């Protein structure tokens, strides 16, 4: 019996449910529904705009405290001048660099996403992690790959 995309999505749905990763389970379920409904236009849209849409929703969520006034001018100044704030700026800059490396790796080898999903599930189960983004996971994997290239 050949391994089909439907079977892989069903397996990811099951693993997501068993691992109590509602995001992975929901994503697999939605993609399985789209596949079974033969709504291929949705795949095109998700491939072209899904990442941007997801990042937009994430940024909106993160920026709500700015919009509703929970972060004051004093908080902003502190975070631009304090050690924790400067480290946060550095962390943000490094994270975006890693994310771009991860995106390049996923574009060059789309099959790598399966390993990232499995790694995310292990992180949830054994490290108490949160599957926030395959981009960061791919970025870290790309960093590891670069490290191994230099150590050979």
Swiss-Prot record:
Similarity comment: family membership: Belongs to the UPF0756 family.
Subcellular location: Cell membrane
Any single Gene Ontology cellular-component annotation: plasma membrane
Protein name in the entry: UPF0756 membrane protein Daud_1310
InterPro entries: UPF0756_TM
One of the Pfam families matching this protein, by short name: DUF441
Transmembrane intervals: 14-34, 51-71, 76-96, 112-132
Alphabetically ordered keywords of this record: Cell membrane, Membrane, Transmembrane, Transmembrane helix
Superkingdom classification of source: Bacteria
Membrane topology recorded in Swiss-Prot or TrEMBL: Multi-pass membrane protein
């Amino acid at each position: 019996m050949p391994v089909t995309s439907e079977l892989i999505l069903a397996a990811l749905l099951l693993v997501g449910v068993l691992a109590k990763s509602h995001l992975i389970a929901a994503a697999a379920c939605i993609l399985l529904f789209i596949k079974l409904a033969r709504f291929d236009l949705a795949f095109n849209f998700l491939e072209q705009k899904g990442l941007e849409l997801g990042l937009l929703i994430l940024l909106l969520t993160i920026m709500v405290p700015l919009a509703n006034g929970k972060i004051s001018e004093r908080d902003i100044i502190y975070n631009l001048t304090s050690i924790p704030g400067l480290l946060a700026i550095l962390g943000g800059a490094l994270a975006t660099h890693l994310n771009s490396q991860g995106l390049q790796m996923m574009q060059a080898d789309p099959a790598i996403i399966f390993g990232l999903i499995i790694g995310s599930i292990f992180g949830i189960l054994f490290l108490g992690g949160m599957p926030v983004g395959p981009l960061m996971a791919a970025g870290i994997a790309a960093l590891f790959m670069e490290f191994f290239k230099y150590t050979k």
